[in-house]
């Protein structure tokens, strides 16, 4: 989930929108990750992490997300990155935490190719099977 371009203000005195940032978000939405990253690199925010993650720069993405505010979304993305990096226990812990914050993450993880294997392997969210 992208952070909207309206969230980034270039000049705190005039509240002038950062049009370059808006362009980068547009690139992300169009899956033009290299172009997005060129603009986003200095921001070091969630969208920068999404661009890194989409290009396979998992350690860079994880570094940024670990320093970001811990929401269900950021913890979910960290779970994916940890799974990619072979840190299964950390991935499971982050996924469970994300699901505690937002129940929709359980459903999402079952459909996610990078996390559904961990869900099955560790028997996560079994109580969801009851209904």
Describe the role of every protein-language-model region:
Residues 1-4, 8-11:
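Single conserved hydrophobic/aromatic residue that forms the stacking wall/gate
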Residues 10-13, 34:
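Flexible helix-coil transition and linker loops at the boundaries of alpha-helical arrays
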Residues 14-17, 50-58, 82-84, 104-125:
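TPR/TPR-like alpha-solenoid helical repeat scaffolds
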Residues 18-29, 33-86:
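Alpha-helical adaptor scaffolds
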Residues 25, 32, 101, 107-111:
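Non-membrane alpha-helical secondary structure
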Residues 41-46, 69-70, 83-107, 123:
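TPR/TPR-like (Sel1-like) alpha-helical repeat modules
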């Amino acid at each position: 989930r992208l952070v909207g371009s309206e969230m980034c203000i270039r000049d705190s005195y005039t509240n002038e929108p950062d049009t370059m940032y808006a362009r980068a978000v547009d690139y992300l939405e169009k899956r033009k990750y290299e172009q997005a990253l060129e603009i986003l690199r200095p921001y070091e925010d969630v969208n920068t992490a999404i661009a890194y993650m989409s290009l396979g720069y998992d350690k860079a993405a994880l570094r940024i997300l670990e320093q970001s505010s811990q929401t269900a979304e950021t913890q979910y993305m960290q779970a994916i990155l940890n799974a990619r990096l072979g840190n299964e226990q950390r991935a499971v812990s982050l996924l469970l935490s994300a699901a505690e914050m937002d129940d929709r993450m359980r459903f999402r993880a079952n459909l996610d190719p990078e996390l559904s294997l961990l869900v099955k392997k560790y028997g996560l969210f079994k109580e969801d099977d009851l209904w």
